[in-house]
């Protein structure tokens, strides 16, 4: 085993950051390209192929750390790792290896915007931890508004956002009166019955019971009838 190669991880990462090819690095380490490839895997270093015929100027990761920077998450992740800006480990679970190999890492954008490469918005996560984030694969982007609960005007139970009353409080042909009081309910129920009270007050039997319970917190059966 070439322990001398393992001991030169930072130096190798620096050469890669400078844009040196694998062939050049292999010559500098006095090893073959295949040997270099094997040790890069052990060191957890990923090399992005570059076409230096068209661009000889290497840009470091720090040049892309702003909102709207034109670089893919994959390339920026590799630059961050190769330049040693972050250690090769998941920032959530802390794993560095899996099955005796460097654990695969993905670049997480905390706000869900893959173009926002500000440093505080970035995190290196393993695929499992990344999949559990609320913005993974574009989920919930811009949906962090507080949920508004709509309630029935009569019994105050939760209903859909477009409705004004629940089904029990809106029987066909009956006019809703949201101002029904506890005294009215107790009067009609104690003197007659729930059915008579529902007809007099313009609310279904079930709706009237729910209305009474929501206003008093008591069981509707607690109303005693006057004989």
Swiss-Prot record:
**Gene symbol of the encoding locus:** hegA
CDD domains cross-referenced by the UniProt entry: HNHc
Protein name, UniProt field: H-N-H endonuclease F-TflIV
GO BP terms, alphabetized: regulation of DNA-templated transcription
Q: Which GO terms describe its molecular function?
A: DNA binding; endonuclease activity
UniProt KW keywords: DNA-binding, Early protein, Endonuclease, Hydrolase, Nuclease
- Recorded source organism is Escherichia phage T5
Q: Explain the induction of this protein.
A: Expressed in the early phase of the viral replicative cycle.
Q: Does the record carry Membrane as a key word?
A: no
Q: What does this protein do?
A: Endonuclease that introduces double-strand break into pseudo palindromic 17 bp DNA sequence yielding 1 bp extensions with 3'-overhangs.
What Enzyme Commission number(s) apply to this enzyme? 3.1.21.-
Top-level enzyme category: hydrolase
